[in-house]
């Protein structure tokens, strides 16, 4: 392993994303999979429990020493808040109440956003649609790092820093790559979040607010669960741009590890994704997969072939009216 990543550009391809064709083939062969495209009634209750757990944690940490507050923010709060962000991910696909009740899904996402400390649920939904429709799309898929990230974060130390700062890159990258007009829902999301933060501060003081913010920053940064950010689409093997992970961390992440299955069928809630693989194993079992998100992070930092540039990119031709 050298001191600098060996890649100097993204992996440019001139083919369509593989998920579209695989989806057609699987549905033609196994039409019963359509029955999995239904709302998950468990999702709203899981969100309620996670939010209440963090509110209880806010009350418990109000008198803790700062060092212990930060410890629990990483060890416990980071897991809960990261789980909530993945609930928001599922909700962005209308998994809680179905496409016919979009408003209920949006407000559940805003509610799930409360322990995260900063408003982002409405913005996430706005951009996540493009991630699926234009996977790896130049100037469209804001999940792909910028050229500046690829150029600068090219050594083990810098890649480690990049992982620590993931929450900032995911928040700021859309504004640079594909800025969009602010929506009414984003404004409401912000107002509700600010009101919640102020209420927590008024009730229990500064420490619970810091606990929630630290839980988000630490839990979405250099954290075992954050391995999924890298595991999902970074090119560990040439020719493959999406990878699944079938390990135990799926239990607390709404099966986000079933990522190939998710991109094949975005309308299937995370709870049902294991059934997709069970019904159509010949489409998934032979694909390369990850077995440890921690190992993913280790390899990303120390393997020369990996870094922010290790992403597949393609150019999409859009209609004149844009998105």
Curated annotation (Swiss-Prot):
Highly expressed in skin, intestine and kidney. It is a multi-pass membrane protein. A motif (Histidine box-2) lies at residues 128-132. One of its GO terms (cellular component) is endoplasmic reticulum membrane. SMART domains: Lipid_DES (SM01269). A motif (Histidine box-3) lies at residues 259-263. A lipid is attached at residue 2 (N-myristoyl glycine). Its EC number is 1.14.18.5, 1.14.19.17. GO terms for biological process: ceramide biosynthetic process; sphinganine metabolic process; sphingolipid biosynthetic process. Pfam families: FA_desaturase, Lipid_DES. A motif (Histidine box-1) lies at residues 89-93. Coiled coil: none annotated. This is Sphingolipid delta(4)-desaturase/C4-monooxygenase DES2. It comes from Homo sapiens (Human).
């Amino acid at each position: 392993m050298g001191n600098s990543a060996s890649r100097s550009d993204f992996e440019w391809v001139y083919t369509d994303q593989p998920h579209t064709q695989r989806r057609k083939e699987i549905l033609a062969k196994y039409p019963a999979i359509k029955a999995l495209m239904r709302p998950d009634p468990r999702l709203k209750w899981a969100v309620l429990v996670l939010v209440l757990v963090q509110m209880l944690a806010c009350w418990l940490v109000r008198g803790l020493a700062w060092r212990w507050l930060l410890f629990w923010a990483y060890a416990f709060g980071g897991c809960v808040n990261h789980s909530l962000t993945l609930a928001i991910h599922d909700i962005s696909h209308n998994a809680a109440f179905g496409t016919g009740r979009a408003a209920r899904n949006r407000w559940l996402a805003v509610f799930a956003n409360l322990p995260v400390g900063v408003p982002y649920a409405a913005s996430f939904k706005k951009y996540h649609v493009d991630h699926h429709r234009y996977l790896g799309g130049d100037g469209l898929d804001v999940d792909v790092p910028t050229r500046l990230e690829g150029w600068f974060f090219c050594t083990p130390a810098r890649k480690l820093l990049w992982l620590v700062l993931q929450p900032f890159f995911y928040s700021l990258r859309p504004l640079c790559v594909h800025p969009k007009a602010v929506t009414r829902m984003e404004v409401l999301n912000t107002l509700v979040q600010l009101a919640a933060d102020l209420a927590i501060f008024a009730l229990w003081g500064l420490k619970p607010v810091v606990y929630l913010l630290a839980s988000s920053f630490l839990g979405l940064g250099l954290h075992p669960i954050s391995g999924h950010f890298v595991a999902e689409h970074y090119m560990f093997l040439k020719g493959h741009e999406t990878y699944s992970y079938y390990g135990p961390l799926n239990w607390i992440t709404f099966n986000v590890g079933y990522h190939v299955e998710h991109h094949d069928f975005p309308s299937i809630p995370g709870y049902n994704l294991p059934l997709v693989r069970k019904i159509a194993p010949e489409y998934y079992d032979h694909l390369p997969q990850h077995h440890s998100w921690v190992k993913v992070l280790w390899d990303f930092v120390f393997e020369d072939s990996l870094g922010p540039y290790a992403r597949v990119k393609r150019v999409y031709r859009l209609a004149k009216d844009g998105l």
